[in-house]
Design a protein with these regions (language model features):
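Long, compositionally biased, serine/threonine/proline- and charge-rich low-complexity regions
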Residues: 1-2, 152, 164-168
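Hydrophobic packing positions characteristic
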Residues: 1-19
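Fold-level signal for large, globular catalytic cores of enzyme and receptor domains
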Residues: 16, 21-29, 79, 85
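Short helix-coil junctions and helix-kink-helix linkers
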Residues: 42-54, 120-145, 183
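Basic amphipathic alpha-helical segments that dock to polyanions
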Residues: 46, 61-67, 134, 150-158, ...
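Short amphipathic alpha-helical interaction segments
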Residues: 51-63, 140-156
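A short, conserved structural fragment
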Residues: 65-76, 155-166
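Short, amphipathic alpha-helical interaction segments positioned at domain boundaries
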Residues: 78-121, 168-183
Length: 183
């Protein structure tokens, strides 16, 4: 099974702490990339930061995808729209996921929010509502949360997905004249 193609704009997210597995036999390009695979930088930026050829970076990321050490997510923007997926239902009653989420998404120095508050915040993600609008709607609740990590956690766990919106061109057709218009 081939890993999916990797594009310049894809953002790789490591699913494991790769520094624990590194040894002298690793590919040198991959060793240079690991510090920059932070879930925020896109492939082209990682290549610039690591001073590596972008094609080699793509190949390394493909290897990480093949072995399920990483996954690709979209570039984070506050104009993005995200929604909950049905896969959230079994997670609502899992205390391990709840505590993992709280520790992953909280800003340093802030107390962890209780699980029901986090799930309420996720439930406020809607079609047509940008992250910017979502933050405005939730107000003070979001101040203790790293929004990028909040969304990334949901995407990694599979219960949040991005809604892609594309403009559609439809040719304008002049309305037909009827007898009422000519009077």
């Amino acid at each position: 099974v081939q890993p999916p193609p990797v594009h310049d704009w894809d953002v790789p997210v490591l699913l494991l702490d790769m520094s624990k597995f590194m040894n002298d036999s690793w590919d040198l390009t991959l060793v240079r990339l690991i510090p920059f695979l932070n879930g925020t930088s896109h492939v082209r930026r990682i290549a610039q930061l690591a001073d590596a050829d972008v094609l080699l970076v793509k190949q390394c990321v493909q290897h990480l995808l093949y072995y399920s050490f990483a996954m690709l997510i979209d570039i984070f923007q506050f104009s993005n729209i995200y929604v909950l997926r049905p896969q959230v239902a079994p997670m609502l009653s899992d205390p391990h996921i709840e505590s993992e989420c709280a520790s992953y998404v909280m800003l340093p120095g802030c107390d962890a929010l209780p699980g029901p508050v986090l799930w309420h915040m996720y439930s406020m993600l809607r079609y047509g509502r940008t992250l910017h609008d979502w933050i405005g709607l939730l107000g003070n609740q979001v101040q203790a949360v790293d929004v990028r990590r909040f969304i990334t956690f949901g995407v990694i766990k599979g219960f949040v997905r991005r809604v892609h919106q594309y403009p559609i061109y439809s040719s304008y057709q002049k309305p037909l004249r009827n007898s009422v218009d000519t009077l």
